[in-house]
Amino acid sequence: KCFVIMPYEKNLNEYYFTLIKPTVEEKGYNVTRADEIYGNRPIIDDITSGIEDADLLIADVTGKNPNVNYELGYAHAKKKEVIIITQNITDIPFDYQHRRVIEYCPQEGEWDKKLKIKISKTIDAVSGIV
């Protein structure tokens, strides 16, 4: 299972559904975000369960969203493998600046292909395939 942590914004939602989710699914993971979980529980319970149950997490920290940072901290406390991506390297929280981060820029040519390759190779690396 892969749980994705990210802000819910129009452009980022598009990137999730057209790029991130399909790329990770190609690697054999069942991919979900909290807004894809239906039920009557408090959303924070769905988020913490999603993080705890995941074998892999992807966190897009674009925009310094406080909810994303909270969830990233929770994943860190649970010692989860997290692939961090962002559109702006300065959005990386201080405590994570020592980590490898995938930076992407939607204004660059073929950015989507580059991001897909980087995510795919990183999944291989953290899964021990490479």
Question: Can you describe what each PLM-predicted range is?
Answer:
Residues 61-123:
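Cross-kingdom TIR/SEFIR domain
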Residues 43-46, 70:
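A generic local structural motif
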Residues 1-40, 47-50:
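Conserved N-terminal substructure of TIR/SEFIR domains
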Residues 46-48, 91-92:
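Short, flexible, glycine/charge-rich loop motifs used to bind or transfer phosphoryl groups or to couple energy/partner
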Residues 54:
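An anion/phosphate-binding loop that grips the pyrophosphate of nucleotide cofactors and donors
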Residues 1, 123-130:
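Defense-system signaling and execution modules centered on TIR/cGAS-STING-like, death/scaffold domains
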Residues 35-38, 42, 110, 114:
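Short, surface-exposed alpha-helical recognition segments that flank or form part
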